[in-house]
A protein has these predicted regions:
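Mg2+-dependent phosphoryl-transfer enzymes with acidic/Ser/Thr/Gly-rich catalytic loops
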Residues: 5, 31, 169, 174-257
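Asp-based phosphoryl-transfer active-site loop
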Residues: 3-23, 51, 177
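Substrate-recognition/cap helix-loop segment adjacent to the acidic, metal-dependent catalytic center
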Residues: 55-74, 134-154
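Charged, glycine-interspersed solvent-exposed loop segments at helix/strand-loop junctions
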Residues: 114-133, 154-167
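Active-site phosphate-binding/coordination module
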Residues: 29-119
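Hydrophobic "anchor" residues on beta-strands that sit immediately upstream
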Residues: 9-11, 70, 190
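Substrate-recognition "cap/lid" segment bordering the active-site pocket of phosphatases
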Residues: 74, 80-98, 158-186
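Residue-level signal for inorganic ion chemistry
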Residues: 16, 71, 125, 177, ...
Length: 257
């Protein structure tokens, strides 16, 4: 358990996990309080922190470059270990962008309150600010259109949280997580995430690892909590811990599944 462990690995998602979702991705910048919390967690030499995000590398480096942690951008397409430059985990194509981004733009023009976020190896149509019913319906239509159009194109179409994402296949948080798990020697592993992209990470964890899904829904995680506030409380408690207590992910954690 936590106090007696010699090497600890934290695999943390960002949006919807450490912070609530914002109306626009750029508005979800971490507060100084959260950065201090991550600094406190990473200050323990036994702790290895990895931020696994769908975000682009520039945003992650701008927001978290000062924290002693490794960064994973675009669900695993790009990795930056502390002290090293960003690296592309495998050769990825962006040829699909010229064909598919116009489809996303059509929907962004057609559905009020929606917009596109283009990243290096992926693109997202966000509908968080749209009329809920109209946005949800359009998301299904867009997904169908993209799947039909991409039958012969090597890309993956994902329905995310109030978003539809197009990305390169064979890249996901499970593969990214294995990069650290394969190093071995971790006797405490904790993974926390909130959506289907995080399920890939939960699926590759060692049997005794702790996994927490934020929010309800079917999950591979061992525990579920209600909100990012619960996650921050948990991590804060770990920073402040004394010794000798048995680790349990939040007194308020529940197993819904």
């Amino acid at each position: 358990h936590y106090d007696r462990s010699a090497r600890r690995l934290f695999l943390l998602d960002y949006d919807g996990t450490l912070v609530p979702f914002a109306s626009h991705p750029r508005l979800a910048k971490p507060e100084p309080k959260l950065l201090r919390l991550l600094d406190g967690l990473s200050a323990d030499p036994r702790n290895q922190l990895v931020l696994l995000s769908g975000r682009d590398k520039t945003t992650l480096e701008d927001w978290f470059g000062s924290v002693k942690m490794d960064l994973v951008a675009e669900h695993g397409a790009l990795v930056k270990e502390q002290g090293n430059p960003w690296e592309m985990v495998k050769r990825l194509s962006t040829d699909w962008k010229s064909k598919l981004i116009p489809i996303l733009k059509t929907y962004a023009d057609r559905v009020a309150g929606t917009f596109i976020e283009e990243k290096e190896f992926s693109a997202v149509w966000h509908y968080r600010n749209a009329d809920p019913e109209r946005g949800s319906l359009a998301a299904h239509e867009l997904t169908d259109d993209l799947l039909a159009f991409t039958a012969n194109i090597d890309v993956q179409v994902l329905q995310a949280n109030k978003a539809v994402e197009v990305k390169n296949p064979g890249i996901h948080k499970g593969i990214a997580s294995q990069r650290w798990l394969a190093k071995g020697g971790f006797d405490f592993v904790l993974a926390i995430g909130d959506d289907r992209t995080d399920e890939d990470a939960f699926g590759v964890l060692p049997e005794k690892a702790y996994s927490i899904r934020v929010g309800r829904g079917p999950t591979r995680a061992r525990f579920q909590v209600a909100s990012p506030d619960d996650v921050v409380s948990l991590l804060g408690a770990l920073v402040k811990r004394g010794t000798g207590e048995v680790f349990h992910p939040l007194a308020g954690a529940a197993t819904y599944h």
